């Protein structure tokens, strides 16, 4: 596990975008695993700028998003379909047929989960998976006490997650109670993983992820078992990492 600490959110975002750019340069038909939420927004902004400067070509890139709310149509402003197209896909030259996001309004949700796993396998697996982290250590919508071997599945969101996401809705009541998410087992199959975190509210989860015991109570601790993980965090998210551990960590200022 490699940990990079940056001075702020902007530098964290830039570093993440550089890693994605390098991956696509090395393999133009890269399969990217993507995340939503406020954390990766800056990375998407930098990737769009790189594309506009002619530094990066997404025409052969394939993407798979981690998750989607159940019950929200793709054109709903709070759906992750809408988020990804509005904030990223509409601004680059990716082919729509190469974009994959779980269908939260599928008639048969179990079949949708099975098909999603099948599509990932058909694409050759995920080359680079981008992750955020919840304040309770969840990755994707894999909540505490999930099995570390799960594939794409339907999950019931915890009150903590609902409260954390209510800022995107008019009220907590409007936040969907269920979602489709790639499982921890699916995520761990990625060839490389980059986890991003910013802000003091993520500091406890980051401390546990980097130095804590492997436990399903903090899903991100499973990343310690992966062979190629880079964690990029700003100083605030790194604020609870013990001083003695900072010696082993790359700090970018």
From Swiss-Prot:
It comes from the Bacteria. Its EC number is 3.5.99.6. Belongs to the glucosamine/galactosamine-6-phosphate isomerase family. NagB subfamily. NCBIfam families: nagB (TIGR00502), PRK00443.1-4 (NF001684). This is Glucosamine-6-phosphate deaminase. One of its GO terms (cellular component) is cytoplasm. GO terms for biological process: carbohydrate metabolic process; glucosamine catabolic process; N-acetylglucosamine catabolic process; N-acetylneuraminate catabolic process. Pathway: Amino-sugar metabolism; N-acetylneuraminate degradation; D-fructose 6-phosphate from N-acetylneuraminate: step 5/5. HAMAP family: GlcN6P_deamin (MF_01241). It comes from Thermoanaerobacter sp. (strain X514). One of its GO terms (molecular function) is identical protein binding. It catalyses: alpha-D-glucosamine 6-phosphate + H2O = beta-D-fructose 6-phosphate + NH4(+). The active site is at 67 (proton acceptor), 136 (for ring-opening step), 138 (proton acceptor), 143 (for ring-opening step). Disulfide bonds: none annotated. Catalyzes the reversible isomerization-deamination of glucosamine 6-phosphate (GlcN6P) to form fructose 6-phosphate (Fru6P) and ammonium ion. It is an enzyme of class 3 (hydrolase). Keywords: Carbohydrate metabolism, Hydrolase. InterPro entries: Glc/Gal-6P_isomerase (IPR006148), Glucosamine6P_isomerase (IPR004547), Glucosamine6P_isomerase_CS (IPR018321), NagB/RpiA_transferase-like (IPR037171). The keyword Hydrolase applies.
């Amino acid at each position: 596990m490699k940990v990079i600490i940056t001075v702020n959110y902007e530098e964290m975002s830039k570093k993440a975008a550089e890693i994605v750019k390098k991956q696509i340069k090395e393999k133009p038909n890269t399969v990217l695993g993507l995340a939503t939420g406020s954390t990766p927004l800056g990375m998407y902004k930098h990737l769009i700028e790189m594309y506009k400067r002619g530094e990066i070509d997404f025409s052969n890139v394939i993407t798979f998003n981690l998750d989607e709310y159940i019950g929200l149509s793709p054109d709903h402003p709070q759906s992750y379909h809408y988020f990804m197209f509005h904030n990223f896909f509409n601004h680059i030259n990716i082919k729509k047929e190469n974009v994959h996001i779980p269908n939260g309004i599928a008639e048969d949700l179990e079949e949708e989960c099975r098909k999603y796993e099948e599509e990932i396998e058909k694409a050759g697996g995920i080359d680079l998976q981008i992750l955020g982290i919840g304040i309770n250590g969840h990755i994707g919508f894999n909540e505490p006490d999930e099995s570390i071997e799960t594939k794409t599945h339907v999950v019931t969101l915890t009150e903590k997650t609902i409260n954390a996401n209510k800022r995107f809705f008019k009220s907590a009541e409007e936040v969907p109670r269920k979602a489709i998410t790639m499982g921890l087992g699916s995520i761990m199959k990625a060839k490389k993983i980059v986890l991003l975190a910013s802000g003091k509210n993520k500091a406890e989860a980051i401390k546990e992820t980097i130095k804590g015991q492997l436990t399903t109570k903090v899903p991100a601790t499973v990343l310690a078992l992966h062979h190629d993980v880079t964690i990029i965090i700003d100083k605030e998210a790194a604020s609870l990492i013990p001083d003695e551990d900072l010696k082993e960590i790359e700090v970018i200022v």
